[in-house]
Amino acid sequence: MSIPNLGKKIIVTVPSTTANLGPGFDCLGAALDLYNEFIFTRIEGDGDRFDLIMESTDGNHLRGGPENLVFRAAQKVWESADVSPFALEARVKLAVPPARGLGSSATAIVAGLIGANAIMNSPLPKEKLLELAIDIEGHPDNVVPSLLGGLCLTARSSSQRWRIIRCDWHDSIKAVIAIPAIRLSTSEARRVMPKNIPISDAVTNMGALTLLLNGLKTGNDELIKEGMFDKLHEPYRWKLIKGGLEVKEAALQAGALGCAISGAGPSILALCKSNNGKVVSQAMVKAWENLGIASRAPFLNVQTKGSQFKTISGK
């Protein structure tokens, strides 16, 4: 396979994600219409050269150099396609804040895979990119919806194959994501979880997940209220999020159908009907404000197209 011409440029747009949604720990996630944009350009130099240029209005940043997730993902593509690495520049426009539970790491992984693949005229199929993305991230709940879009349930089957189910999301159900000006790493959020759980907690979560998925499919308020409940991770993680339970209670009092930690946190997801999203958003921001924490709570739609790319110069 030939190395792309100097100057070839690919633009990749990757949606943010909210994972778990309460009971769907490490298997359920939805893509949202908040995006990071990555522009990849073939530049002069060998495969060890990877230039990362970030544009952000709020001080967010990604780690540069060979350890960067974008570069690591690109390397996986080169290895899988059996090609020699080549020099790349990645210009990143950040809108998805890192360490907030919105899948910023997943956007970097997915962008690196798609960008490196597309700049070589896409030798790897999407199924292979999904496999690589899950391998790099270590769990599927962010990278799968980030790549495919929509609400995705991903599980490893008895044959050890990843099975992905695209689940329905009723048009009447909207998402409010309260994003505080504090950070929480996924590794820290995982450290507080127990290594073993009671069987009763596992059974509770299986039932809750079934109720939630049916509620999201049909738009049934009661099923969403009863299904957005977790016993596996949230009881241990709420204590890491200052004011988290107060924000959750404020959202529910304002009419939210359900509330959960978005991914590993600290952002908080509230599901609501479209006619009361503004009230829920204001209540969540106010609850954090009362504790001296700045936040914003955008009203977001589920993004169904997943990651997109286009060639803007070169062949």
UniProtKB/Swiss-Prot annotation:
Record gene name: thrB
Name by which UniProt lists this protein: Homoserine kinase
Entry EC number(s): 2.7.1.39
Any one GO MF annotation of this record: ATP binding
Catalysed reaction, written as an equation: L-homoserine + ATP = O-phospho-L-homoserine + ADP + H(+)
PROSITE patterns xrefs: GHMP_KINASES_ATP (PS00627)
Presence of the UniProt keyword Amino-acid biosynthesis in the record: yes
Subcellular location(s) of the protein: Cytoplasm
Residues bound to ATP: P97, P98, A99, R100, G101, L102, G103, S104, S105, A106, T107
Annotated signal sequence range: none
Enzyme class: transferase
Major location category of this protein: cytoplasm
CC terms in the record's Gene Ontology section: cytoplasm
Keywords from the named record: Amino-acid biosynthesis, ATP-binding, Cytoplasm, Kinase, Nucleotide-binding, Threonine biosynthesis, Transferase
Pathways involved: Amino-acid biosynthesis; L-threonine biosynthesis; L-threonine from L-aspartate: step 4/5
